């Protein structure tokens, strides 16, 4: 019997945690591969999980065995049928900067009912076992260990076993088969309960992410549970939950939005909860103070040095973020564990924990995108995390000398940090210029000067949560204030698809003794467009689209093939810089998923590439691939070049690089046309994938990787190194590309499995 219940709860947890990345991955193509998809999914699943706990509590307390046997099992069967009926999400009816409501609707249709029922399984199975009359039924908490093991299996099996080997349709079929098996196991579990059992004082109602150790090893004394205590529980659960989503979004926005970068933070979060409830939580809280301060210092440096992240190794970025999440999660969950009530109040305790977790999802997934122009929720939760440190009660210190020292730390350090930031902000630039070092070294020294003293102060204040919180808030607030008041930032906005900003920069042209100003469009940490502001230079294409770069050379080759005019279909608008290459006889249609990007590119107060275009230019809003499919189905006129340049910050929307996508591009091409793909990426090597996709479609494959060494040093601010690949089925077009002198025939550096709409594996594309 024990093994039966262990397997049942193990199966339920495995299903619970494997369905989340599976459904989220199926939604990525519908919403442009945005990293916000997973944040919204977590919000939805945390909320449904809370509803599942409420349902389980109601069933165990109010529903008879007979009704459970037929009513609950009947609902499970309905959920299984619903899982088969709603198997594919639908795209939003129109482009939107905030499609969260539509995404939540799709989540509810595709997986809402099955997830709701499986989320109630943990407490229900434990409750059923408590009513079996087994010798261990008085203490069913050992089943939490099986639940936690199943959670890890479900989480880690998906990116390492399931995703690399199974397509989405196969994944869904296997999951629904597992759900069907769980229904049978649940039916048997209810049959094993004693007849007439309705309510048992030993039956727990907790969450899946609950203690795997001895729950009675150290609950807090049975103090009255007032609203202050409930608010503490909520806060202790809120901080790790918000940190989980912040770290996940931070990673997936600049690498790629894919399951491994979703489940690793979630696995760390789960592990911190298991350890916190299994260990001596009071001792754990004390031992975590210094590590937590050190981790937060590292995260603060990352926040303040956002540009440094662009050049940091991916492993270092992931390691620092996961370490921070682990320490903060362990602290928050240890605080929860040390304050947990006696067993008679566990139902309320776990319910409030789940409310705190859901609030973290609401804050990161809904509130922050609506009220913040940047990812302010990340530094905010950093400050909240410091508040988890024990607050020193200065009033209870009897020694006058120690009391004065405590006040000096709490008040003096924040004030000193504030004064230091003001002084350095005023004189640091003059100091590094006086040192006479290179521009790169100036940036490093300047950052070190500004961050050094506040970092030391944060560490000195580690023993007082209030002091540490105030000291941490100073450099973060100063950085945010400088960013908000920077006169060179002309636009800042946040949409479902990322953070956008329009920034002015300049350099001095020594040859003509003139100040040259240029404007950049930033998407996260990635530059998505550059334009000179000097009137005589606004028509010059810059950035990745410089006339002497790979994109410029490919367009020049097409002009020679199509002297009477060419039609361009371009997925990804940016600032519209490619328009500067066009002749009056050409025409361009852009496909852009983010309406805010279109607003920026079309508004001449920001960029004038579109408003000053010499040829007809149009912008269609929506996912580029879906719009191309609609054009194909409607039989619209084809293009001479389909250019794919759609980034989500520095990540690639996977659905634009599948074999079905390549076929679609060819369907929209005229004879002799070119598919041009921009594959520059800091972390992913997409060349082998694109080469194999091209060969699979009987294409000539060409590639040009322009290194930084090929660009004049004085032009690096507005001419960027980039990697482009070109596919064509025409030998004449291929020869024209090769004759341009830059593109070379592509070759496969190693073999990778081709991506399809049902299968993709980002792990295979990481830089080797």
Spans of model-derived segments:
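Alpha-helical transmembrane segments of multi-pass membrane proteins
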Residues: 1-742, 757-768
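Low-complexity, Gly/Ser/Thr/Pro-rich intrinsically disordered linker/tail segments
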Residues: 743-747
């Amino acid at each position: 019997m024990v093994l039966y219940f262990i397997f049942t709860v193990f199966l339920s947890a495995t299903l619970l945690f494997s369905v989340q990345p599976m459904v989220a991955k199926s939604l990525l193509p519908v919403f442009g591969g945005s990293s916000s998809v997973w944040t919204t999914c977590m919000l939805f699943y945390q909320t449904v999980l809370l509803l599942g706990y409420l349902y389980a509590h109601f069933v165990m307390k109010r529903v008879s065995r007979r009704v459970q046997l037929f009513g609950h099992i009947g609902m499970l069967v309905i959920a299984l049928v619903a899982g088969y009926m709603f198997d594919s999400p639908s795209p939003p009816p129109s482009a939107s900067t905030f499609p969260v409501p539509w995404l939540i609707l799709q989540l509810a249709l595709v997986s809402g009912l099955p997830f709701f029922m499986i989320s109630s399984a943990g407490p229900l199975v434990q409750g059923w076992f408590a009513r079996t009359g087994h010798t261990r039924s008085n203490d069913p908490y050992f089943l939490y260990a099986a639940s936690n093991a199943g959670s890890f299996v479900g989480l880690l099996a998906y990116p390492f076993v399931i995703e690399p080997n199974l397509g989405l349709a196969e994944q869904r079929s296997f999951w629904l088969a597992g759900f069907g098996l769980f229904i049978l196991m649940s039916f048997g579990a209810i049959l094993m309960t004693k007849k007439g059992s309705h309510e048992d004082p030993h039956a727990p109602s907790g969450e899946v992410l609950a203690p795997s150790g001895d729950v009675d090893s150290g609950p807090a004394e049975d103090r009255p549970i007032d609203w202050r205590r409930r608010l503490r529980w909520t806060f202790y659960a809120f901080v790790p939950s918000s940190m989980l989503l912040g770290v996940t979004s931070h990673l997936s926005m600049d690498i790629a939005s894919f399951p491994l970068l979703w489940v690793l933070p979630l696995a760390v979060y789960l592990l911190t909860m298991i350890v916190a409830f299994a260990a001596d939580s009071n001792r754990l809280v004390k031992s975590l103070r210094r590590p937590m301060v050190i981790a937060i210092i590292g995260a603060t440096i990352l926040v303040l040095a956002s540009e440094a992240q662009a050049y940091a190794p991916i492993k270092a970025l992931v390691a620092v973020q996961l370490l921070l999440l682990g320490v903060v999660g362990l602290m928050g969950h240890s605080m929860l564990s040390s304050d947990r009530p006696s067993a008679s109040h566990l139902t309320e305790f776990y319910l409030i924990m789940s409310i705190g977790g859901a609030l973290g999802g609401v804050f990161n997934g809904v509130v922050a995108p609506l009220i913040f122009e940047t990812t302010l929720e990340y530094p905010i939760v950093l400050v909240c995390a410091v508040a988890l440190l024990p607050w020193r009660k200065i009033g209870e210190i009897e020694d006058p000398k120690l009391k004065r020292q405590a006040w000096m730390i709490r008040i003096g350090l924040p004030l000193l940090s504030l004064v230091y930031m003001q002084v350095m902000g005023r004189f640091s630039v003059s100091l590094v210029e006086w040192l006479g070092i290179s521009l790169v070294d100036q940036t490093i020294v300047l950052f070190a000067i500004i961050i050094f003293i506040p970092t030391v102060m944060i560490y000195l204040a580690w023993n007082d949560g209030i002091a540490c919180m105030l000291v941490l808030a100073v450099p973060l607030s100063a950085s945010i204030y400088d960013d908000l008041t920077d006169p060179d930032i002309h636009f800042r906005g946040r949409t479902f698809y990322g953070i956008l900003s329009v920034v002015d920069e300049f350099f001095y042209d020594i040859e003509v003794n003139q100040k040259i100003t240029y404007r950049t469009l930033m998407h996260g940490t990635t530059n998505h467009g550059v334009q000179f502001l000097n009137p005589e230079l606004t028509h010059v294409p810059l950035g990745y689209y410089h006339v002497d770069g790979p994109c410029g050379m490919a367009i020049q080759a097409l002009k020679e093939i199509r002297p009477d005019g060419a039609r361009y279909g371009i997925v990804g608008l940016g600032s519209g810089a490619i328009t500067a290459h066009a002749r009056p006889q050409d025409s361009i249609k852009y496909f852009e998923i983010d309406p805010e990007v279109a607003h920026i590119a079309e508004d001449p107060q920001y960029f004038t590439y579109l408003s000053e275009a010499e040829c007809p230019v149009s912008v269609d809003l929506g996912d580029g691939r879906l719009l191309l499919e609609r054009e194909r189905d409607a039989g619209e006129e084809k293009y001479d070049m389909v250019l794919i340049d759609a980034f989500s910050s520095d990540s690639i929307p996977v659905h634009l690089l599948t074999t079905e996508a390549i076929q679609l591009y060819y369907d929209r091409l005229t004879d002799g046309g070119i598919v041009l793909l921009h594959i520059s990426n800091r972390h992913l090597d997409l060349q082998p994938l694109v080469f194999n996709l091209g060969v699979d479609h009987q294409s000539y494959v060409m590639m040009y990787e322009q290194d930084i060494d090929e660009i004049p040093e004085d032009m690096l601010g507005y001419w960027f190194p980039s990697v482009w690949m070109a596919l064509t089925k025409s030998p004449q077009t291929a020869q024209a590309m090769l004759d341009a002198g830059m593109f070379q025939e592509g070759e496969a550096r190693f073999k990778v499995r081709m991506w399809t709409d049902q299968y993709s594996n980002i792990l295979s594309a990481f830089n080797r």
